[in-house]
Amino acid sequence: MSYLGIDLGTSGLRALLVSDDGQVLGSVERSYNSEHKHSGWSEQNPSHWVAALDEAALELRERYPEFADLKAISVAGHMHGATLLDENSDVIRPCILWNDSRAHIEARQLDETKGVRELSGNIVFPGFTAPKLLWVKNNEPENFARVAKVLLPAAYLNYHLTGDYVADMSDSAGTSWLSVSARDWSEDLLRAGDMRADQMPRLVEGCQPAGTLRADLAARWGIAEQVIVAGGAGDNAAAACGIGALNEGDGFLSLGTSGVLLAARDGCYPAPASALHTFCHAVPDRWYQMGVMLSATDSLNWLAQVTEKTAAELTGALGHTLQPPGRVLFLPYLSGERTPHNDAAIRGSFTGLGKDTAQNDLTRAVLEGVAFGLRDSLETFSQSGTKIERLIAIGGGANSTYWLKLIATVLNVSLERPQDGDFGAALGAARLARIAHTGLHPERVLLKPDIVETIEPHAELLAAFNESYEIFKEAYPKVRDIQMPSGS
């Protein structure tokens, strides 16, 4: 027996095949492009997702004989995208993606609507789904009038696989149409966004069966028996499943292009005023909260570009011993900031530069600035009652031991480095497929990876970094006043 996890990413699709005991058999990848017709626009043609999935499945069939005994499939997808279908289930226009910011006016108006934050549990960001539909209504009324169904990217692949309109709660929580606490579509939120319940897909939990694979696809892929399609998940919930972040206090730190701090919750405790995301998890009776900073390794890669070095060269030059906070302060807002400021206009800055400032000082400042930005997210977690004592560190930035020592100390949280292997969204999706087929309890399947190293905070530097963090916090409003003196 085997299970297939699909990670429908922004730049490509990854298909991961696992055995009946959860061991990775192999994976294949396919890439596709986004279109950016105007500044702030980001779109994709859903037919490219379908083609990528079909090519990946056919390659898996050729490479792995276990694929013929496939029992279940699950899709994890990039969240918030608006795929619009007409009454014939034809795609009306390209999907508007999560990183499309055209609906900023509609997002602000919707966010200011009474009850929206309370019901949805979140600020309405421009990248969320509901403001995109209001933008279509205001700017493409002929397309809005044709909308029969709105599907998120993962739900669109669910439709392709099963012929049914079905989505899971973790993905749907990022639409601003779902009551995150009730785990169901909200009539009030739909009404606020000029949408109807019949335009929404049926909801299931991510680890529950959503349907079965279409017979024609099964025949094309060389599968003789019935295949279950699980509800699936949004990409971050799937990543949490892949790394075993299921119960209260479980969490991970992702040091990628952006920085993500995610913690599982056993209840729904929204804190929208802090720009902290509160979403349904992919398993019943679980939620998760997530703080996002927009420029984590992006900040280091920017410095590497302007100094004509590699990121590894910059961090390697610092050595292995964690140093006290430097005099140079960096605000890592190269593309604005999400948590806790929800400020798309703010930009980064250095302060404290002198004639004696050297390259290593800039590197330390960038690493410290990112660590302080993550501390901002951690502070919002504390305000909502989330207790985090340790985090699993993943992503490209986690390869820097110096950076992990720094972050552990700034956060005063132990960081665990996992053994090399697969524990991302594709694995999480495959695990959800396995649960949907076997009925196993999620805790028996959503296991944590083996930990090869635990990095503890440097107790002797806690006070110094706490003091530096307070300066970092005070810098944001002052720099914003300089950059936007009119308060715009």
Regions picked out by a protein language model, each given a short descriptive name:
Residues 26-30, 201, 453:
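Structural signal for short hydrophobic segments within the conserved structured cores
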Residues 9-12, 69, 76-78, 129, ...:
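Short, basic and Ser/Thr-rich N-terminal targeting/leader segments
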Residues 61-98, 122-127, 154, 158-179, ...:
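Short beta-strand-loop/turn "lid" adjacent to the catalytic site in phosphate-handling enzymes
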Residues 66-69, 196-199, 387:
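Short loop/turn motifs at secondary-structure junctions
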Residues 8, 46, 87, 101, ...:
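Generic detector of well-ordered alpha-helical packing
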Residues 4-5, 104, 108-123, 134-166, ...:
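Active-site core segments that coordinate phosphate-bearing ligands/cofactors
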Residues 1-94, 118, 146, 218-219, ...:
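N-terminal glycine/serine-rich phosphate-binding loop of ATP-dependent small-molecule kinases
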